[in-house]
């Protein structure tokens, strides 16, 4: 609510998206906010709704991490709910991981982290589309500060501010 909508919430799974959407939909009055959930509309319609609606909040998965251009004050915040690691059981990912392991390398550090960092960078790139764009990035996944590999993600941020307290966060956003 601090940014009056104008926010993308990016998810790595539909189950998490649906859970949070259903948990939050009554928190945002319909007359004040437009909640847009992936699969309720085609992608192009969701983007159009986001650009033209009052105080929009978009809940999206994979296809909204990249290739969406919303410039200026239309998008003020990108919230990343979880670091975008590929599902290791995906057949292509699984084959790549096995090949890396066969060569005696650490597949997590050599492949999975770099791929997730690229996707992460694409996700936060939704916010800054031109030299004059500004906004807030909120990362809900505490692995960026608790795990050693988190520094790879934090290094991609334009300005790195880590805040633990809700009141501090709201003050900065406003």
Sequence positions of predicted segments:
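ASCE RecA-like P-loop NTPase motor cores
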Residues: 1-174
